[in-house]
Amino acid sequence: MSSTQFNKGPSYGLSAEVKNRLQSKYDPQKEAELRSWIEGLTGLSVGPDFQKGLKDGIILCTLMNKLQPGSVPKINRSMQNWHQLENLSNFIKAMVSYGMNPVDLFEANDLFESGNLTQVQVSLLALAGKAKTKGLQSGVDIGVKYSEKQERNFDDATMKAGQCVIGLQMGTNKCASQSGMTAYGTRRHLYDPKNHILPPMDHSTISLQMGTNKCASQVGMTAPGTRRHIYDTKLGTDKCDNSSMSLQMGYTQGANQSGQVFGLGRQIYDPKYCPQGPAADGAPAAAGDGPGPGEPSECPPYYQEEAGY
């Protein structure tokens, strides 16, 4: 198998645009620093072409054995493509065992096929920073040293005292006051005497945010608990007014529904508005108002049951 089997032709369209953007992020100055750092640790020459000098993986595996001895036990010297890819895979595995973050790694094809040399450069810079963090001394100052953990242990008393401390993100209440504020529940008017606006004509002016109940009344409402009778057109009873209420509005005359016919209307009975109806509870019947002997009662049997409640 020839060494040119994995080579690709030129890219076009979107692939070419992506490749050009990745190449634009490549830093030649960082490449020169990495070249000096690798050659100083391994003693091997990378060559003028950075990608071709590292694509076989021999120099990179040697670098990892210098940073962490024995991390790559076998280095393939063959020029076959799968041997070179195996070296790159072993180098990536050695970086993981060295403590590299997964986001800082690159794939073998990124270097072997020049797919993403920018990511290769980022990975090698992160490797140099990890080596500096572990105390490696080299003649080239490259990479960023990782920060170390600064752990603090506090006792329970200190932790409880910290609960009373207001962080700077919470703001401050040192300048807050309620001077000039009216008492809670006081009427707030929509006029300002400083602007020479006349005061309201009455005391019904309130803020728009407060709403109003000035027009609410209970005129025409019956007292709570007033008896509501049931009328039935089959029994010859008629409505006294238009105050009829459906059965769904409730029934308060008993705990059962015996004798009720669902679906019929209900009306609120009041002798003031129904002069032809039976007399109010407890009121004596006038002479001649009651039924004579043998005559049926004007009130239907249902009214007589209701009156006995």
Swiss-Prot record:
Residues 277-288 have a biased composition (Low complexity). GO terms for molecular function: actin filament binding; calmodulin binding. One of its GO terms (cellular component) is actin cytoskeleton. The modification Phosphoserine is found at S138. InterPro entries: Calponin-like (IPR050606), Calponin/LIMCH1 (IPR001997), Calponin_repeat (IPR000557), CH_dom (IPR001715), CH_dom_sf (IPR036872), SM22_calponin (IPR003096). Residues 273-309 are annotated as: Disordered. Keywords: Acetylation, Actin-binding, Calmodulin-binding, Phosphoprotein, Repeat. Signal peptide: none annotated. The modification N6-acetyllysine is found at K8, K25. CDD domains: CH_CNN2. GO terms for biological process: actin filament organization; actomyosin structure organization. Belongs to the calponin family. Thin filament-associated protein that is implicated in the regulation and modulation of smooth muscle contraction. It is capable of binding to actin, calmodulin and tropomyosin. The interaction of calponin with actin inhibits the actomyosin Mg-ATPase activity. This is Calponin-2. It comes from Bos taurus. The lineage of its organism: Eukaryota, Metazoa, Chordata, Craniata, Vertebrata. The gene is CNN2.
